[in-house]
Amino acid sequence: LEINVDLTPIIGKGFSKLLALGAKNTFRRLPMTSRRQVLQGAAALGVASLAPAIHAQPKPVRIGYAMARTGPWTGGAQVSQEPNYLLWAEQVNAAGGLDVKGVKRPIELISSDDRSDVETCVRTYEKLMGSDKVDLVLPPWGSNANFAVAPLANRFGYPFLAPTALSRKLIEMKLPYFFLLLQQPQPMTNALVDMFKANGVKTIACIYVDDLFGLENYAALKVALQGSGIQMIEEKSYPSGVKDLSPVLRAIKDKNPDAFVGFTYPPDTILASRQAKEVGFNPKFFYASVGTAFQLYRNVMTPAGAEGVMGMGSWNAKTSPGAKAYFDAHVKKFPGKEPDRWASGHTWAGLEILTAGVKQVGLDRKALRDYIANTNHKTIIGDVKFSGSENIATPGTVSQWQNGEFEVVWPTKLATAKINPNKPAWK
């Protein structure tokens, strides 16, 4: 009996070469029992030779998060945060994995839809950190969600680098594991008022959404206005999910302020802009908040219609070589979808900080927290340094749509373009 078996897939090329060099003939002359023993031994040898390779495969770094994929938070979450998480994981894995103190390990993202619901968000993070015991977490979108999950960061000992939360109350809670990447309400409104003063504004009107974000920014604006010589001649709150702002805008138009300020979310930002155009309200300065920095705003309003509109923004592709590389990579992965010119950059900066921290100290979360808290970080948006939970290195900024780009116009040391102090007519 002659048995012809290709053992290469089992025992590797080396053993197969021995057969080719003469062992094959000897094998044929062996009794059947001996042949079986040779085959069994060879198979065992092959498995043993594979064992080191199997054991050498590094465990993935499991990183969990909840993100709005449905509900009213979706517009912000799916522009400013989740695309950046996906891009980061893809880039890191393509480079061999996350560097954990010199060992490259693949990233495994574990995520779910928080449905724009605070309770769902809290339950998800409790599970991720409490029972799933993921290695790291990434934050959810928005001030309300982050306010709810921030205490969990401290309870479970997981560093959070939050790129879309504005809240002085979060800073005052003194949570050592929670870090806010965005400029907070006071520096942002201080920059806005400084810009107004430098350009001769005497009167302003303000509307604000009646939630944590709107209330804190409105309060910060009132503080910033003290001693400025600028008078607030109208101030109105509105409920989340508002569908019509035209009565408020008509009343403001009648008072003819030099500047309009809206502490608004993306749907309200677009609503206020569209309805201001409809009622013919076109002050010298028109400033809205979240969403103004989005490509969506330019697309909906058209580049000509967005021209001169100001809002919360802090970077664009001109800010740094790293910012341009990030912008180009984002557009390549998500064709036709640009990162927004505010929180997207801060999201990426947070991922840069996390990457550098894990490389330096590994996955020891206490050591990682200490690294984040005590390091002056170099990022695409510039230096980031924390005092407590607050990023104190990134100054307040104002941006403005000019020729299809959301340009940083204040302060002048960070400007990517000169300010246009007279908004053109809506188009």
Residue ranges of predicted features:
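Extracytoplasmic ligand/sensor domains, especially the bilobed periplasmic-binding protein
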Residues: 83, 134-236, 284-310, 317
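Beta-alpha junction/loop-to-helix N-cap segments that form part of ligand/metal-binding clefts
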Residues: 76-80, 98-172, 181, 238-245, ...
